[in-house]
Amino acid sequence: SLPVTHTLKYFYYRSSGVPNFPEFLAVVMVDDVQISHCDSNTRRAEPRQEWMEKVTADDPQYWERETAKFLDAQQTYNARIEILKPSFNQTGAGVHVYQSTYGCEWDDETKKINGFSQGGYDGEDLLRFKLKEAICAAAKPEAEILKRSGDEKKAEMESLKYYLTHECVYWLKKYLDYGRSSLMRTELPSVSLLQKEPSSPVTCMATGFYPGGATLSWRRGEEELHEEVEPGEILPNPDGTFQMSAALDLS
């Protein structure tokens, strides 16, 4: 079954005290396919798909702007870690990680649009942007210092809402157009049945399908089985396609 909801997601990772790992990392993904990357070692935004080279034909300054955006985010998250440390009663060096993700979703059938933005600190939820109200909600008391800062800047929050529901969607559609032959392709799976022993569950394995939106079910006649079935996750293959399985308990 083909997905109709497309996504553009940005992932930022800012750490302190983590050895042998970039202090800052940014990854951009379209429909869960990585399209660009930047980190504090290279300090340069770079494409991760060949078709992303097409962007500069229409926009020669694209990669310079992306690099500037990512490096600006690094400075922002540097400051946030320093602001948060006292709130969590943290002193000295130590290992600390600030992560954030934001982006948008677009349904190419219903045309419905959604946006999201959230941040986490040391592996726990910290802030979440409420799109409809255009406000930040703190997931824990220590995040209030950042939440208040956001609420005081109402214009900035409205600007974020506009970005997530307009500009982000504009770029999502643009990336989909650039990578249409890859992102919008369809590949059917090969399907096999596996059983270790006569008393073992029978596993239905489907692999090699693209895109990754799919369902796999066992049926008895027209009835879909649920209680007897243990479904597996959709997992990526090395060649960019996907696989999934569902085990049927015969006992």
Ranges and model annotations:
Residues 1-199, 203-207, 229, 239-249:
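Extracellular/lumenal regions of secretory-pathway proteins
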Residues 208-216:
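Solvent-exposed loop segments of extracellular immunoglobulin-like
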Residues 216-222:
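Conserved aromatic beta-strand anchor motif in extracellular beta-sandwich/beta-rich domains
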Residues 221, 250-251:
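Solvent-exposed, well-ordered amphipathic alpha-helical segments
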Residues 223-229:
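Short aromatic-acidic-glycine turn motif
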Residues 234-237:
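Conserved blade-ending motifs and adjacent loop-strand segments that build the rim/top face
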